Amino acid sequence: MAKTIIDDKSRIENMITNIEYCIGKINSTEYADFVDNIDVRYAISMAVQIVCESAIHITNDTKNRFKEIEWKEMQTIRNIISHEYGALNLEILYNTIKDDFPVLKAKLEMIYEKIG
């Protein structure tokens, strides 16, 4: 089976879509409900993992062009979610989505408009 090549613009669009999903879920979920509801936690964690996995596969050219994105940090988050899920701090995850994802989304939307 041939490997499909996904371009940076498509990856960034996918990141934005999953960020929007996370923000929507977090904004409609109190922290206590987030902690208590395993389905919501898993859904949000998967969407965050998709965002971070997509970031890993962005080309170095794009990463070097847009250094305002913390590309390496997203790889670290992805590794924790994928390989050390028990070490995931739910409060940090919740607050990261609530506080940092809107800013990340805005930056990615700007990049999306600038790349071909």
Question: Positions of the model-derived regions?
Answer:
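Solvent-exposed interaction patches of small proteins and small membrane subunits
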Residues: 1-116
